[in-house]
């Protein structure tokens, strides 16, 4: 227990994974699909204690879900890829979860008098997206004077998820609706690569992490994602 003075260690986690799936390969691509269940006994958690975070074995956590990925070549030059995941995650047992010290959550989750933890059994863990998916397309082509090029576009969606236990979505959440694209070239001799790229072209705003601020009751800290970003990369191969 990391809350015990002088003890900064925790016991190992014990994970049990069950998965059943199907793989299909055909002329122009493939599809993989899997159902899974993961159970973690004694999962390690950084529990907030008011003045800092303590690593401890918190109980049992279960993830159940569906995973799908595949690729399909529409032609020799154009390839479509996709992946998706659905996860139902729950704390089966979490007796010493971080209680709400911000006053932003429901009163039932407020810190009890003289305590800094609360029973979160039955609640959903923070930071695990219930649904996420990625769709991408890559078009490859030959240059008139030799060399090769490609154009790639990708869309990523991650359903909004809370970033800290008991802090509402409206205060601290993470999600993605990002469009990325790149245009690249390789010289005929393979010595030079050049790529023009853009990330988060939708300029989607979200936090990537958030947590209660140590020694400042009623407040929290967070880090935003990168805004719309453009760049050019030139590489010499030896």
Region locations from a protein language model:
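Gram-negative outer-membrane beta-barrel transporters
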Residues: 37, 57-165, 235-237
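Membrane-embedded beta-barrel scaffold of Gram-negative outer-membrane proteins
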Residues: 9-73, 79-81, 85, 89-95, ...
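Flexible domain-boundary/linker segments
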Residues: 37-39, 50, 87, 99, ...
């Amino acid at each position: 227990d990391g809350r015990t003075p002088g003890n900064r260690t925790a016991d190992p986690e014990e994970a049990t994974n069950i998965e059943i799936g199907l793989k299909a390969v055909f002329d122009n691509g493939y599809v993989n699909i899997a159902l899974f269940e993961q159970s973690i006994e004694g999962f390690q958690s950084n529990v907030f204690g008011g003045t800092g975070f303590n690593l401890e074995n918190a109980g049992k956590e279960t993830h159940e879900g569906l995973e799908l990925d595949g690729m399909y070549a529409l032609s020799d030059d154009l390839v479509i890829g996709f992946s998706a995941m659905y996860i139902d995650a729950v704390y089966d047992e979490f007796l010493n979860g971080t209680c709400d010290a911000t006053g932003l959550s429901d009163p039932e989750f407020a810190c009890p008098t003289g305590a800094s933890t609360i029973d979160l059994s039955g609640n959903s863990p923070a930071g695990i997206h219930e649904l996420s998916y990625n769709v991408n397309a890559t078009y490859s082509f030959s240059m008139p004077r030799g060399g090769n090029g490609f154009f790639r576009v990708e869309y990523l969606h991650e359903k909004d998820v809370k970033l800290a236990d008991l802090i509402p979505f409206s205060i601290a959440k993470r999600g993605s609706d990002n469009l990325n694209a790149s245009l690249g070239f390789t010289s005929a001799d393979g010595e030079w690569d050049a790529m023009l790229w853009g990330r988060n072209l939708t300029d989607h705003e979200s936090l990537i992490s958030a947590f209660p601020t140590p020694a400042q009751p009623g407040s929290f800290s967070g880090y935003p994602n990168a805004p719309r970003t453009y760049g050019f990369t030139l590489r010499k191969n030896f």
